[in-house]
């Protein structure tokens, strides 16, 4: 009888958490948006996660893996695994830093060319989202997300 009551309680709680849990809803939105971007980028052979990493490398040329991981909200192991995929595609190069343990990231010429192809597609997806949500709502969402990230670090 106790298990039956627990199941009913959990069923009700699952409805509440689905509506109220920040993490659940952000992850759901992230998965769905990832699908939208990945579908648009499919002809380029690049996924949106790879695009994000390549743009971070482009904006921080010659930086170390450790320094790049922090602003991306990634641990170094995950970043290293994702960077290796891009290196295997010839899109970035991973070099040795002053300290042999340091790994330096740079875009390759092929990586630059791929980004030149991907950016207009990414901009198109951004534009469609802005049209659906409205510019103001999208700006507010982005501001709220930055606030959430900042507050989560404390």
Q: Where are the predicted features?
A:
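C-terminal regulatory/oligomerization modules of transcriptional regulators
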Residues: 1-15, 136-154
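N-terminal leader segment of winged-helix/HTH proteins
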Residues: 1-44
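Charged, amphipathic alpha-helical coiled-coil/dimerization segments
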Residues: 34, 84-143
């Amino acid at each position: 009888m106790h298990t039956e009551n627990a199941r009913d309680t959990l069923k009700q709680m699952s409805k509440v958490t689905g509506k109220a849990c920040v993490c659940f809803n952000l992850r759901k939105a992230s998965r769905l948006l990832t699908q939208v971007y990945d579908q648009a980028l499919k002809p380029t052979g690049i996924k949106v996660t790879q695009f994000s990493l390549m743009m971070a490398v482009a904006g921080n040329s010659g930086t170390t893996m450790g320094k790049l991981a922090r602003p991306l909200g990634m641990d170094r192991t995950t970043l290293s695994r994702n960077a290796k995929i891009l290196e295997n595609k010839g899109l970035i190069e991973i070099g040795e830093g002053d300290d042999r343990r340091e790994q330096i990231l740079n875009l390759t010429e092929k990586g630059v060319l791929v980004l030149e192809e991907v950016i207009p597609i990414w901009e198109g997806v951004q534009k469609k989202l802005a049209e659906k949500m409205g510019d103001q709502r999208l700006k507010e969402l982005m501001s709220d997300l930055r606030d959430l990230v900042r507050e989560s670090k404390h």
